[in-house]
């Protein structure tokens, strides 16, 4: 992986949400640095002032921290905008050495000459000797012949004939460097040895490799372009169409360990048949050479299943701690004083075995802490038929007398159901809806035990009154 100390960088732009693709690239970079005993640099490419916002930079740092890439464990964040003078100096050097020239061609003028402004620049200003001035961008003088060969750990050695690479812009008319140049200057001066990034940047690589050479680098960095991430229709993930914001998964209750494990599978696989593996195993076995170049399918259903498995592997105490943010405002719809930690703890193991994301805990246990059962109208209409009113009355009378314990409550309802010609499954339906508000949920009798006799009896009576009109 090259000689000397390995230095990688993760260079996101603070122009919106933190994409799951960016999270994967960050993890790949982090692991390469960790395995090599090298350095991870966070460089925030904030040169697009019209689109950047400080809160998005904060969001990047927070998201990385959630993934285990914590401040203090890396260099940065370095704001690319703080290095604007270095970028300008590099542009001036390219011009002074005859490796770049000024151009005043507009898109319209190019279209007139070529018939198509999308065909690329035709080199019209190459030998005009223009000086810097308003409306004049600086273009790199691409070699007329030869081939630029990119050695990529994932994609082999793609070749780019130089004649197909247009004289590309490296600095705008105001002197500010464009992404291509700023990126190379920063990588070169920061001593970056490995550039690990998304496949969409591969087309930029021959241009950047030419700039590395022009700016005096002995060799380009080690390139590694990780595969594009696609949805179920094999379309590239889009923030306009797909659920791609890492923050949305975090806020929904995905565990960072599950997310990290799943993201690592987007182009790579751990040894053996198991995909759910300890992070220590991933950290000790990950190698860029094993990353596949083919598109990686982001399967939300699989991620959710992963998360559910990670939740089930927690201890009950860890699970209770993990769901704590959802058991209080603003996530919880009940008053803070209504929360009963003992009642929740009694049902926590049952809930843990059923949730796939932590936020699912709220509708699973809200009946415990709300003053009234959160009745689902469709569930009510389906369950409260036939002898429901009489059954609820009989259950109420029996439950007022017997021991308040799940098995006893079950036996009691079984007995009442038989009197009404109902098997236990049918007899449970109106009781469940009356007490919990829903037709499905945690095991009924454990739920009743946790809810308590007084509240259960009150809700059974209220449900019967609603059915009978008084």
Swiss-Prot record:
ATP binds at residue 239. The keyword Oxidoreductase does not apply. Its EC number is 6.1.1.17. It catalyses: tRNA(Glu) + L-glutamate + ATP = L-glutamyl-tRNA(Glu) + AMP + diphosphate. It is an enzyme of class 6 (ligase). Keywords: Aminoacyl-tRNA synthetase, ATP-binding, Cytoplasm, Ligase, Metal-binding, Nucleotide-binding, Protein biosynthesis, Zinc. One of its GO terms (molecular function) is zinc ion binding. It is found in: Cytoplasm. Its cofactor is Zn(2+). A motif ('HIGH' region) lies at residues 12-22. Belongs to the class-I aminoacyl-tRNA synthetase family. Glutamate--tRNA ligase type 1 subfamily. Monomer. This is Glutamate--tRNA ligase. It comes from Frankia casuarinae (strain DSM 45818 / CECT 9043 / HFP020203 / CcI3).
